[in-house]
Amino acid sequence: MKQALRVAFGFLMLWAAVLHAEVRIEITQGVDSARPIGVVPFKWAGPGAAPEDIGGIVAADLRNSGKFNPLDRSRLPQQPATAQEVQPTAWSALGIDAVIVGLVTPNPDGSYNVAYQLVDTGGAPGTVLAQNSYKVNKQWLRYAGHTASDEVFEKLTGIKGAFRTRIAYVVQTNGGQFPYELRVSDYDGYNQFVVHRSPQPLMSPAWSPDGSKLAYVTFESGRSALVIQTLANGAVRQVASFPRHNGAPAFSPDGTKLAFALSKTGSLNLYVMDLASGQIRQITDGRSNNTEPTWFPDSQTLAFTSDQAGRPQVYKMNINGGAAQRITWEGSQNQDADVSSDGKFMVMVSSNNGQQHIAKQDLVTGGVQVLSSTFLDETPSLAPNGTMVIYSSSQGMGSVLNLVSTDGRFKARLPATDGQVKSPAWSPYL
């Protein structure tokens, strides 16, 4: 946790939170079918009101995962603060087989101790399944809550939690000197800050695998350019500013390469830069347009969009040579893929019968499942644990961010009131 705190502290030191309206998750479908769980409000052991509702943060995280349905506080049969106070039968009678309790204690130095316990109320009643405590300053109380959520989520599902991650996105506001902003927030929309403001469009943010940098497209020079910005100090490195189009950056999982699309020779083609040397290699060639690269876990293979068969479809290709292989066959066109960190599936924008939705394709069987039901969906980005997808869609006259679970059962919106929100990118684990 200390390493993650240092990374996040670097963000806080350089940018104050945005005063504009932040995005917030609004669940639209699926929580009722999820596993019920009890999350008791964490007991506050200090004077006055608690500085943060840690239990509420944990409950929201678990609900937002789409895999849990925390019991409403008005229905809690008791409000214990420790495992010893939990009465398992009171919870099991409500179909609850696990309960989270906790305690927040102020320290003389101004810090806080946050402690939680995950208690079995089903198979082995009263057994403590997981527990931990953290000493944090006030600004890290939400982070402590997300940490507890990550640990509980992994204990109960076997899947690493992704509640301490962030999302990057572009907001286009109405008017002002800098109507385009690249922003970053916690995955749930809290702690939003601005990375870059521009009078011209910003596009396609992409995270480095260590979460320390963002690559993106800017038009501030009058034409498109690819840059990489270091979040800790704001330093900007220009990667590509060739004639015509420079776009669609994607860091390799090993952090040594950046793939992107250029049209300096006419058609769009894929290129890969070695980030240490700055050397650029052309990967695809020909008259077709090849763009929107995404990496497989081996850092040697790309999935990408190509119109070589007429309509856009997703192909894959080794960057060291060989022919491109088409991997999408369902629907009239498929594009803008994002491959999961284990390489077992990808999500993409799939169009069929005039509808444009987010779909998931199993890369072993080829099976395709449509996940979203919103309008003109685009730019899907997977959570690092592969359980959720964030994407943008059209709503009214603007665009908003949406979440959908990769099993398609859970859906939520992240609306913002101060502009159009698009081009989301989910961070790696931080």
From Swiss-Prot:
May I ask which residue range the UniProt record assigns to the signal sequence? 1-21
- Keywords per UniProt: Cell cycle, Cell division, Periplasm, Signal
Q: Which GO terms describe its biological process?
A: cell division; protein import
UniProt subcellular location: Periplasm
Might you report a single GO cellular component term? periplasmic space
The answer to whether keyword Cell division applies is: yes
Q: Which domain of life is it from?
A: Bacteria
Query: Is Zinc tagged as a keyword?
Result: no
Task: Return the InterPro entries for the record.
Answer: 6-blade_b-propeller_TolB-like, PD40, Tol-Pal_TolB, TolB_N
- What is the protein's known function? Part of the Tol-Pal system, which plays a role in outer membrane invagination during cell division and is important for maintaining outer membrane integrity. TolB occupies a key intermediary position in the Tol-Pal system because it communicates directly with both membrane-embedded components, Pal in the outer membrane and TolA in the inner membrane.
* Family, per entry: Belongs to the TolB family.
Q: How does it assemble?
A: The Tol-Pal system is composed of five core proteins: the inner membrane proteins TolA, TolQ and TolR, the periplasmic protein TolB and the outer membrane protein Pal. They form a network linking the inner and outer membranes and the peptidoglycan layer.
**Name assigned to this protein:** Tol-Pal system protein TolB
Which species?
Salmonella typhi
